[in-house]
């Protein structure tokens, strides 16, 4: 039995379910409704993530959404990590899938950047620092938030592999692929030169 499976299938499945249950909580939708702003899915991109919440003009609400979406990746991983590395990775996968495909919203969720960050914080804070450096550097230089996130996410499994975290690297290879898939519209706009830049009005 490999170390990742040492906890046994019941623990892995329980961790996956725990992660999904946390990840599927649509904080962006909940917070905007509680704030009296209606359904965030009816504005902007229709996404439930922090970037679209920011389009309501409420920066504090967007920041709260970002924090909550990150924590729903961090907390289940830390909890499941008490059972071993395998359950921690399963919880991370579950949280990310829950955010992208929440059952409560017809499996139409966010794009996953905040939850990606949250899972990474729990599993490799050092790699998160590298992710942040790449994201901030590219965002500052090119003014494309989506491109910065895509590049940082693609670099993440490579960095993890270089640090000797093979199992975590494999997980983030899957997460990065899903994140890129969810960003397909952004990628098309980047290719066409129509993607909005950071700070751009209208």
Swiss-Prot record:
Determine if Disulfide bond is one of this entry's keywords.
no
From the UniProt record, give the pathway where this protein acts.
Lipid metabolism; phospholipid metabolism
Key words of the record: Cell inner membrane, Cell membrane, Lipid biosynthesis, Lipid metabolism, Membrane, Phospholipid biosynthesis, Phospholipid metabolism, Transferase, Transmembrane, Transmembrane helix
Q: Give the transmembrane ranges.
A: 11-31, 87-107, 116-136, 158-178
UniProt keyword annotation of Protein transport present: no
GO-annotated cellular components:
plasma membrane
What are the subcellular locations of this protein? Answer: Cell inner membrane
This enzyme catalyses:
an acyl phosphate + sn-glycerol 3-phosphate = a 1-acyl-sn-glycero-3-phosphate + phosphate
Q: What Enzyme Commission number(s) apply to this enzyme?
A: 2.3.1.275
Q: Main role?
A: Catalyzes the transfer of an acyl group from acyl-phosphate (acyl-PO(4)) to glycerol-3-phosphate (G3P) to form lysophosphatidic acid (LPA). This enzyme utilizes acyl-phosphate as fatty acyl donor, but not acyl-CoA or acyl-ACP.
What is the protein name given in its UniProt record?
Answer: Glycerol-3-phosphate acyltransferase
Species of origin:
Methylorubrum populi (strain ATCC BAA-705 / NCIMB 13946 / BJ001)
Q: What is the lineage of its organism?
A: Bacteria, Pseudomonadati, Pseudomonadota, Alphaproteobacteria, Hyphomicrobiales
Gene name of the encoded protein:
plsY
């Amino acid at each position: 039995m490999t170390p990742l499976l040492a906890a046994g299938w019941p623990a892995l499945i329980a961790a996956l379910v725990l992660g999904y249950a946390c990840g599927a909580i649509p904080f962006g939708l909940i917070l905007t409704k509680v704030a009296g702003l209606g359904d965030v899915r009816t504005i902007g991109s229709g996404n439930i993530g922090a970037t679209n919440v920011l389009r309501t003009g409420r920066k504090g609400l967007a920041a709260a959404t970002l924090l909550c979406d990150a924590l729903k990746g961090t907390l289940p991983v830390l909890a499941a990590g008490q059972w071993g590395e395998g359950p921690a990775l399963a919880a991370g996968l579950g949280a990310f899938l829950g955010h992208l495909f929440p059952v409560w919203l017809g499996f139409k969720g966010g794009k996953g950047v905040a939850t990606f960050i949250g899972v990474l914080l729990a599993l490799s804070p050092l790699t998160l620092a590298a992710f942040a450096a790449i994201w901030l550097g590219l965002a500052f230089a090119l003014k494309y938030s989506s491109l910065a996130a895509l590049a940082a996410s693609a670099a993440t499994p490579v960095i993890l592999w270089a640090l000797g975290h093979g199992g975590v690297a494999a997980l983030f290879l899957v997460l990065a692929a899903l994140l890129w898939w969810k960003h397909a519209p952004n990628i098309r706009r980047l290719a066409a030169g129509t993607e909005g830049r950071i700070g751009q009005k209208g």
